[in-house]
UniProtKB/Swiss-Prot annotation:
The keyword Cytoplasm applies. Gene3D superfamilies: 1.50.10.10. It is an enzyme of class 3 (hydrolase). It is found in: Cytoplasm. Monomer. Pfam families: Trehalase (PF01204). This is Cytoplasmic trehalase. One of its GO terms (molecular function) is alpha,alpha-trehalase activity. Hydrolyzes trehalose to glucose. Could be involved, in cells returning to low osmolarity conditions, in the utilization of the accumulated cytoplasmic trehalose, which was synthesized in response to high osmolarity. Its EC number is 3.2.1.28. The gene is treF. Belongs to the glycosyl hydrolase 37 family.
Length: 549
């Protein structure tokens, strides 16, 4: 079964006549002519071909048996295993022996699969190293080479070297990589920047978009579209000229806007929603509506407690993963219950700000190349998006940006995602000033800014602080002239990370910052990860700007 743009489509996403158990949703549109097979990965010279099938597709009931039996503590382990022989032979063997009285599932898996390698197990940090030295010495530990790919594994081969976040994440991730690149540039690792630039361009060429990560099970979704920001970084640091990426930026834009022209007001298709006034805004989406391979058991359990059709819940869980904020009160109908997730009904402020940046980048590079018609078209698109955001996502009463629930036609919760319009230059100065006041009073702590002001047990909420949010807030407020707030966030975050490093001698994915005593951040569906790519990247860049704490 090939990946498709829509597999097992959610009944709520259909507007065609089929037999359904649930009432059709008048808001959603599905177009038969837009369903086409995912492109197969191309061969990379000297490397085995990547397999476009996900482990759940390929191993069928064996996959479900392994995940249901919890033979590994982390649901991501089995999808990341690589087969020792042809996967079809493994499935045939499993079907022959699974009903034997002495069948041992764990031994079967160990005999037929290579378990994921933990690359950093032998690395021990030197407690005498400064924070800067520690980060610079971690880049080789977090670097993966193309030859690491094993035939038939879920890992998608890439033509060049790349950085992984660390811990359970042994592949490259889309939006993580941008913040990691900030540190690579500061460390003088132009070699790795060039490799990663080529890898992301290659993925757009071969898949039509940048997947969530380079795994087959990530092909059905992307992540926050930050390639335009990467291109800007490549240009600023002299790594690659921006002009060479214009076609790639246009291809990514086409992916995010697919189906837009066929929509009428109050309809949605994939990532696009046409608002009541005819304007276009975007949402997060995943083309599949099945449990995620990497969190299969967790998704099945969540759906059981939802009281909704399971495929609806799976789609929203997947879309939440596409947002990068997996998970947060931003996506929940009931902030204390993950089963109430409704990601696809929210118009996110950060996503639309990133797409504003993408539209602006296409316009700017088109101008450099003398393509005046394209420049004018995309300036108009960026302007229209900013106007729509101001109509639907700006809360003038409270002076903040908020996500918008397009189904209920009401504003949603306030979070640190509200700072992204400043980072991409979409806000006006009055909006920036008012948002600064809200951040000071509602999100700022002695350790940095909180992801949100709500305690839900989810990792992208209070009490946690995340490196990418700090960076965008620092630069965003400084861009609008609020150096005082930007510098305060920067120094607070550096103090948080350095204090934890001095005590634990490591960098981690997220930090508990709510009470001024930095410690490990909690929440989420997996244990805290160390490494950690984007924390290293942001902190290394801040050290270059502010010095070591």
């Amino acid at each position: 079964m090939l990946n498709q743009k829509i597999q097992n489509p959610n009944p709520d996403e259909l507007m065609i006549e089929v037999d359904l158990c649930y009432e059709l949703d008048p808001y959603e549109l599905k177009l038969d002519e837009m369903i086409e097979a995912e492109p197969e990965p191309e061969m990379i010279e000297g490397l085995p071909a990547s397999d476009a099938l996900t482990p759940a597709d390929r191993y069928l009931e064996l996959f479900e048996h392994v995940q249901s039996a919890k033979i590994f503590p982390d649901s991501k382990t089995f999808p990341d295993c690589a087969p020792k022989m042809d996967p079809l032979d493994i499935l045939i063997r499993y079907r022959k022996v699974r009903r034997h009285r002495d069948f041992d599932l764990r031994k079967f898996v160990e005999n037929h699969f290579w378990l994921p390698e933990v690359y950093s197990r032998e690395y021990v940090s030197d407690p005498q190293n400064s924070l800067k030295e520690h980060i610079d010495q971690l880049w080789p530990v977090l670097t993966r080479e193309p030859q690491d790919h094993i035939p038939w594994s879920s890992l998608l081969a890439l033509p060049q070297s790349y950085i992984v976040p660390g811990g359970r994440f042994s592949e490259t991730y889309y939006w993580d990589s941008y913040f990691t690149m900030l540190g690579l540039a500061e460390s003088g690792r132009e070699d790795l920047l060039k490799c990663m630039a080529d890898n992301f361009a290659w993925m757009i060429e071969n898949y039509g978009h940048i997947p969530n990560g380079n795994r087959t099970y990530y092909l059905s979704r992307s992540q926050p579209p930050v390639f335009a920001l990467m291109v800007e970084l490549f240009e600023e640091d002299g790594v690659r000229g921006a002009r060479r990426y214009l076609d790639h930026l246009k291809m990514e834009y086409a992916f995010w806007m697919d189906g837009a022209e066929s929509l009428i007001p109050n309809q949605a298709y994939r990532h696009v929603v046409r608002m009541p006034d005819g304007s276009l805004l975007n949402r997060y989406w995943d083309d599949r509506d099945t449990p995620r391979d990497e969190s299969w058991l967790e998704d099945v359990e969540t759906a059981k407690h939802s009281g909704r059709p399971p495929n609806e819940v799976y789609r929203d869980l997947r879309a939440g993963a596409a947002s990068g904020w997996d998970y947060s009160s931003r996506w929940l109908r009931d902030t204390g219950r993950l089963a109430s997730i409704r990601t696809t009904q929210f118009i996110p402020i950060d996503l639309n700000a990133f797409l504003f940046k993408l539209e602006s980048a296409i316009a700017n590079i088109s101008a450099l190349k003398g393509e005046k018609e394209t420049e004018a078209l995309f300036r108009q698109k960026a302007s229209a998006r900013r106007d729509a955001v101001n109509r639907y996502l700006w809360d003038d009463e409270n002076g903040i940006y908020r996500d918008y629930d397009w189904r209920r036609e009401q504003l949603a919760l306030f979070s640190a995602a509200a700072i992204v319009p400043l980072y991409v230059g979409m806000a006006n100065h009055e909006q920036a000033d008012r948002l600064a006041n809200a951040v000071r009073s509602r999100l700022l702590t002695p350790g940095g800014i909180l992801a949100s002001e709500y305690e839900t047990g989810e990792q992208w909420d209070k009490p946690n602080g995340w490196a990418p949010l700090q960076w965008m807030a620092i630069q965003g407020f400084k861009m609008y002239g609020d150096d005082l707030l930007g510098d305060e966030i920067a120094r607070s975050w550096l103090k948080t990370v350095n204090q934890f490093y001095l005590e634990q001698h490591k960098m981690i994915e997220k930090y508990h910052i709510a009470d001024g005593v930095p410690r490990e951040g909690g929440g989420g569906e997996y244990p805290l990860q160390d490494g950690f790519g984007w924390t290293n990247g942001v902190v290394r860049r801040l050290i270059g700007l502010y010095g070591e704490p």
